[in-house]
Amino acid sequence: MIIKKPENFNEQIEQFGKCLEKFNKIHSITNYNDLSAVIEDSLEGLKFITEMPKVAIDIGSGAGFPAIFLAMVLPYTKWHLFEPNTKKAAFLTYAKVNLKLKNIIIHNTKIENETPFIADLITSRAVMKVPDLIKISHGFFDTHTKFLFYKGSNVKDELGNLKAEIFENNMRKYALLKGNDVC
């Protein structure tokens, strides 16, 4: 899917950087200093999605990578960010408000504690192994859902017998799974 960045993307990125720096000084939620690499990594995953999702879930959203950047470039997608850590959820809310991202809902809980709903896309970045991600997202996907997991070098070992397409960019491996392959 070819995505066009919104006109105010650079301003939003600058504002996000300020939010992260300010919040991080007090709460130490991440150790990333180079946002450009994180942004590129976050957006790279969209190259492997062929249809525009209406509803998306990000599991373990942390400091907002990749979810905040994906929400910026997919403004018509309703994003549900699940983050059980209260400090990190507070940061996500702070960033959402400052960036005026009306397409984001923050859930300060584990996904498995939420009432299920079906998403078109489920993302996660380095939270846990792929089978565990699928297990905890049970009830949130159907045969049409796509899973886009931002993984590292052990992704093939994690997948086991699960069917997935793996795309590589530098050190990152993106695992794309289809709901009909995991249902």
From Swiss-Prot:
GO terms for molecular function, please? rRNA (guanine-N7-)-methyltransferase activity
What the record says about family reads: Belongs to the methyltransferase superfamily. RNA methyltransferase RsmG family.
UniProt source species:
Campylobacter hominis (strain ATCC BAA-381 / DSM 21671 / CCUG 45161 / LMG 19568 / NCTC 13146 / CH001A)
Q: Matching InterPro entries, A to Z?
A: rRNA_ssu_MeTfrase_G, SAM-dependent_MTases_sf
Name-wise, this protein is Ribosomal RNA small subunit methyltransferase G
Q: Where in the cell is it found?
A: Cytoplasm
Residues binding S-adenosyl-L-methionine are 60, 65, 111-112, 125
Job description of the protein = Specifically methylates the N7 position of guanine in position 527 of 16S rRNA.
